[in-house]
């Protein structure tokens, strides 16, 4: 039997709303008192009043007595919910996946289904564990070695970095995995030394400017597979690894690589160009010394580096980075010691500019039977003696592209300060320069036109350095730690060699530099597939695909040793 409590203490939600509004508008009770009497919050009472004034509230009696029926979930949807929970996805993530498939369910419905299936709630997790950053961005997987490529069996992966696999046969040919082992590079429990090395190499081959930009490839399993990983290591891991290397590791790595390349006949080794390059550093607290930066025409803080280039093949074959001012003059002797370990019995002709070393070191080179061609520094005394020269001889430099092919020369034997004996001096004018050049050499037998032409081609090493700066971002110095700088330069040398090896197999593009090869052949999308343990790369139709099709891939290594000797094939549409 109903009494007054039916009106003063309503139970049903619709009636509580009605009595609350009546008490506020008719009985003029304050908001807080109405809220306490009918079990609402003060804010909810104000919301009811707002909805009542605007006619947006329904005060009719609910037919289901405030007990709405539960959303029915099909067995198919229920199975998907269970499967996704087994992958440790939250109810909210499951709702998003269902929404993508056109199934609209609430989070509470998903939680009810999970409870009915006896699946416990997930413990509270941080955003990082969930796989999201503070800004809601997805967190990539942790990099780790692939035990076998069978983990990718049957998958088809599209990547903008698939072009790096074109270097895989040449990497195998150079035996870089064996070079890493010979150098004794360190690894970690999760990532081996070879995998780290190939990760750095992949970034170099793609022209990546800094380690921080590796995030562009954080979700690319194709590049990860190239390095024998699920994905490439993150920026912190790469930077930390480069700091773990010491000079002994780098010396072994460089020597093992150059010895391997030399055995393959990549270097002529008869003439070698040498040059310094200052890698600028702009850090506020830089501890690096100041060196002359020729490209900028001024002295600035930076890392002084050395490059040695085979004059015939134009390949870099030696680098150094940990060079102080007082050590710069003796670098020619340090290089010679390295070259004797690599190519015993071969004495090259060294080409360098006037400021590369001292006359005393030139004397030491002469005593060891090493020929050199360099410039003599012009002074007032030399320029005054030039006026006495009258018997000039015109020669022809065998270079069809050279603008000034017929300069005038004058030969003589001259002594040098701190040099035992005399050197052959060739004064050259009419070569497009305002002032004449004074070439000095200890080669007494070579024809003068050959000596002049050989020195004139020293610009090749400058072009090589310019290419390293432009494409391999040599000047993107992110650390004053010179060990890290030297490692980056060695990786530049290796990447440059691989681009050269690719160019030698591209008909009509043999003389092209790395930027052009990357633009025409490497850059762009490709699809990688793994089937029955075989790796296949498919590249979409591009203008230069016929050139790639003509490469004799069958004569190059067909298996990738660091991927369990998995066979690899290329398809160009």
List the model feature ranges, each with a label.
Residues 1-17, 64-76, 185-192:
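Short, Lys/Arg-enriched anionic-surface-contact patches
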Residues 142-156, 363, 368-463, 468-470, ...:
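An anionic, glycine-rich sequence signature occurring as long contiguous blocks
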Residues 70-105:
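A short, amphipathic alpha-helix used for macromolecular contacts
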Residues 13-29, 78-88, 197-205:
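Short, amphipathic alpha-helical "recognition" segments used to contact nucleic acids or chromatin
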Residues 32-83, 113, 117, 121-136, ...:
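Short, basic alpha-helical/linker "hinge" immediately adjacent to a nucleic-acid-recognition surface
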Residues 36-47, 99-112, 189, 220-237:
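Short, basic interhelical loop/turn and adjoining N-cap
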Residues 214, 447-482, 487, 491, ...:
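Short amphipathic alpha-helical "interface-anchor" segments enriched in bulky aromatics
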């Amino acid at each position: 039997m109903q009494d007054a409590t039916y009106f003063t203490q309503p139970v049903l939600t619709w009636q509580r709303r009605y009595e609350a509004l009546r008490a506020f508008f008719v009985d003029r009770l304050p908001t807080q008192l109405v809220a306490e009497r009918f079990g609402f919050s003060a804010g909810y009472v104000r919301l009811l009043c707002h909805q009542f004034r605007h006619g947006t509230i329904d005060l009719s009696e609910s037919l289901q007595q405030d007990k709405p029926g539960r959303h029915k979930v099909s067995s198919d949807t229920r199975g998907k919910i269970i499967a996704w929970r087994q992958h440790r996805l939250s109810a909210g993530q499951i709702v998003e996946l269902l929404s993508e498939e056109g199934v609209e369910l609430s989070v509470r419905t998903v939680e009810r289904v999970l409870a009915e299936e006896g699946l416990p709630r997930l413990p509270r997790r941080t955003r990082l564990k969930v796989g999201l950053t503070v800004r809601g961005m997805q967190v990539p997987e942790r990099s780790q070695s692939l035990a076998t490529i069978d983990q990718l069996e049957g998958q088809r992966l599209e990547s903008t970095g698939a072009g790096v696999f074109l270097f895989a046969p040449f990497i195998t040919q150079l035996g870089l995995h064996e070079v890493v082992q010979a150098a004794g590079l360190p690894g970690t429990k999760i990532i081996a030394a070879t995998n780290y090395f190939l990760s750095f190499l992949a970034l170099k081959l793609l022209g990546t400017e800094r380690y921080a930009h590796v995030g562009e490839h954080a979700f690319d399993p194709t590049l990860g597979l190239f390095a024998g990983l699920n994905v490439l290591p993150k920026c912190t891991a790469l930077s930390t690894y480069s700091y773990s290397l010491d000079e002994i590791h780098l010396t072994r790595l460089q020597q093992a690589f150059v010895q391997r390349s030399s055995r393959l006949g990549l270097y002529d080794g008869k003439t070698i160009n040498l040059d310094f390059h200052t890698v600028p550093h702009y850090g506020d607290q830089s501890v690096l010394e100041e060196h002359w930066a020729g490209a900028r025409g001024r002295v600035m803080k930076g890392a002084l580096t050395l490059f040695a280039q085979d004059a015939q093949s134009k390949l870099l074959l030696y680098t150094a980075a940990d060079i102080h001012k007082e050590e710069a003059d003796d670098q020619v002797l340090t290089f010679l010691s390295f070259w004797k370990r690599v190519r015993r019995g071969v004495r090259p002709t060294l080409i360098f500019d006037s400021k590369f070393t001292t006359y005393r070191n030139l004397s030491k080179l002469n005593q060891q039977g090493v020929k050199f061609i360099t410039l003599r520094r012009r002074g007032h005394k030399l320029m005054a003696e030039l006026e006495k020269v009258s018997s000039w001889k015109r020669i022809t430099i065998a270079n069809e592209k050279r603008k000034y092919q017929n300069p005038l020369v004058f030969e003589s034997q001259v002594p040098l300060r701190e040099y035992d004996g005399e050197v052959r001096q060739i004064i050259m004018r009419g070569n497009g320069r305002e002032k004449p050049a004074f070439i000095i050499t200890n080669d007494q037998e070579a024809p003068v036109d050959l000596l002049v032409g050989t020195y004139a081609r020293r610009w090749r090493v400058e072009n090589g350095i310019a290419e390293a700066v432009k494409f391999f971002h040599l000047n993107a110095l992110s650390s004053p730690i010179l060990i890290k700088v030297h490692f980056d330069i060695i990786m530049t040398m290796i990447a440059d060699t691989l681009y050269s090896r690719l160019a030698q197999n591209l008909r009509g593009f043999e003389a092209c530099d790395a930027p052009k090869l990357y633009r025409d052949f490497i850059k762009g999308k490709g699809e990688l597939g793994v089937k029955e343990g075989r790796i296949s790369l498919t590249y979409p139709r591009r203008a230069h695909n016929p050139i790639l099709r003509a490469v004799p891939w069958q004569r190059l290594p067909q298996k990738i040793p660091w991927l369990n000797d998995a066979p690899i094939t290329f398809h160009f549409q």
